[in-house]
Amino acid sequence: MSGKDNKGSIRFEIQNFSGLAKATEHKPVQIGHVEWILGAFTSTSDATNNAKHLGIHLKCNEELRSNLWSCDASIRFSLLRLNSNEDDDAFSMEFQQKFDDLNKIVVVNNFKNWEEAICYDNRFVLDKHAVLEVQITVNKIAGIHERIIETFDQPKEHLTDVVLVLEGKHVHVGKQVLATSSQFFQKMFYSNFAEKTQAEIKIDDVTHSEFIDLLNVIYPTHMLINSSNVSHLLKLSDRFAVPRVLEKAETFLILDQKTHLIDKLKFAEVYRLSRLQNACLSQLETSEDVTALKHHENYKSLDHITYNALLQKLIDLLED
């Protein structure tokens, strides 16, 4: 593992910090080839001498069920002082921690006294929000192999023969690889389009980093589809006609337990994912399950085609 790959940080901005009650978590982040989740909560217990404290936790590979892995890491938790020009102006704690199947989380119940955390003079809270940060250095891992993710920023002899330009950045790819996976690129490279003979081809209205994710799923790298990239992978695989990536993203959503059913139904609706819609409808086992969906904030964003499917599901349940 390179020194660059084994270090990283998670910066977690918490809105309405003074109203923090139940635990809140940042989305998963990959550092050192393992998945990390930073969370914050308030705690009043014997561990805090019955005084309210800001608590903080860090989860490592929470979803991994294997017992064949371990991770030794150096961790630095920080509550940042806002409106400060000093890089090290923060309240911090440092730990050395070994994570494995039986120890996936480190919890600090008494990270910072609550009154001190929200005190205006201490400058931890600005405009009702605060910022937590964890810096992670993965010192040693076992049972987890390095994932090779390409950046496509350099040409490779015999493997790349065209340059795509996105947001002013060069992306070096092979025509045959893209044409094999994508009808869009097959037509671009091998039909009577002007781009056929161009050494550089500009791709508009696409975020560079998101397109790199798409390429890493098309190419035989080790990019995993997750809750952070599934949305733009669906969008781009639909735009560029890459059915294999669309199918992989659909399979991820079918198996994913974190994405809400309403959001899954919306994805299914937009990208015509019949397997995903069927899986969602199959999870609705009672009429109450169906009617409860209307309370979700994104329920009204659904189109009539999904409403019709939900109505038919409700009718079927009531008739049983």
UniProtKB/Swiss-Prot annotation:
Gene3D superfamilies: Apoptosis, Tumor Necrosis Factor Receptor Associated Protein 2, Chain A, Potassium Channel Kv1.1, Chain A. PROSITE patterns: BTB (PS50097), MATH (PS50144). InterPro entries: BTB/POZ_dom, MATH/TRAF_dom, SKP1/BTB/POZ_sf, TRAF-like. Residues 7-136 form the MATH domain. Transmembrane segments: none annotated. It comes from the Eukaryota. Residues 160-227 form the BTB domain. This is BTB and MATH domain-containing protein 36.
